[in-house]
Amino acid sequence: MLQSIVLSVCMFMLHTVAASGPQSYQKLDFTNVGFTGSYVDVNKFKDITNNESCTCEVGDRVWFSGKNAPLADYLSVHFRGPLKLKQFAFYTSPGFTVNNSRSSSDWNRLAYYESSSKTADNVTFLNHGGEASPCLGNALSYASSNGTGSASEATVLADGTLISSDQEYIIYSNVSCPKSGYDKGCGVYRSGIPAYYGYGGTTKMFLFEFEMPTETEKNSSSIGYYDLPAIWLLNDHIARTSQYPTNANCSCWASGCGEYDIFEAMNGTEKNHLYSTFHTFQGIEDLGTGIQSYGYITRNTTGTMKGGVVFDSSGNVVSFISDATPFNGTVSADTVNDLLAAIPENETYSSQLMSISATAPSTTSKSNGVALTKMQNGVWYYILAIFTAFTQVVLI
């Protein structure tokens, strides 16, 4: 009976919100980000070039906890065309809270790319140009200067490089991984690949200057993401093992090690709407759909966009677009908070993630894993999300 009432209310509110549709914003906020949970990582590859026996084995559960978890781990930065990258910067801070500069510290830039000068500090461009595997897909390789070809060594992306629909490249740091191994710093990864760490820390900021022009090439059935550009973050283990596996055991992604889409065009009917989405199990069962902001950022197809994402120390994650985005070596806490505060409330969409409780066992193994989400938790997440969207529509 209660479930029927809940679903009826959900349908009514969803109909009301859907009638108006998602709105355009300059800033997409998520609060209460981070929970205690676990995922399974790849422990062993087997026969990775054999069509019949290619497979992967997973190890014990890896537990995580705290603000922004599991995205407090090392992350790689991914780009899909049509896109032209002009600047990229990664920052960390000893402590930063959105809207509270008094208790926040400045941001220090630890990685930087600028296209016209070909500056590339602590940046390595990779793509999926390596050896093919029937269960793992293509391995990582160094990207050539055009982003899509392969190179024999680390190469800086050329100025003005435009990648087309479906084409991707990745940015990792220039810090080399230790030897492949389940208990090593980078986990198990494929032999022969250029293996680097991503960018870590609970409190971090990724900034971008970029273009997302309308695709000029003709569409075809071989293009999976036609005119759907994106910038997103993945747990850095994923691409080193398999970003696009045919076997779910060949990547920690399916068990929830972490993805955050900063700016992503989701489908052809909304190709100029850039959404932010969490692909974690923080209150939802459908990892593929994820936890998406109901609002979107408008894609500028004729000019340059500046913006990025802030992961603060208190579990707030903010995607934003602003022409005032700085790329200095040091950015003060006041500068970041003033930039975010300058975006009006009616240009801000806020979502709160669910609180999830789980306790890591004293000894962990695959059999000790717990179900992190229940059906009722998923229902309550949708109620909260729909209610938030309904409230936003009423206030506009």
From Swiss-Prot:
Glycans are attached at residues 51, 99, 122, 146, 174, 219, 249, 267, 300, 328, 346. The gene is TOH1. Probable circularly permuted 1,3-beta-glucanase involved in cell wall modification through beta-1,3-glucan network alterations such as increased branching or remodeling. This is Probable circularly permuted 1,3-beta-glucanase YJL171C. One of its GO terms (biological process) is cell wall organization. One of its GO terms (cellular component) is plasma membrane. It comes from Saccharomyces cerevisiae (strain ATCC 204508 / S288c) (Baker's yeast). Present with 5525 molecules/cell in log phase SD medium. One of its GO terms (molecular function) is hydrolase activity, acting on glycosyl bonds. A motif (ExDxxE motif) lies at residues 259-264. Gene3D superfamilies: 2.60.120.200. PANTHER family: CELL WALL PROTEIN YJL171C, PROTEIN TOS1.
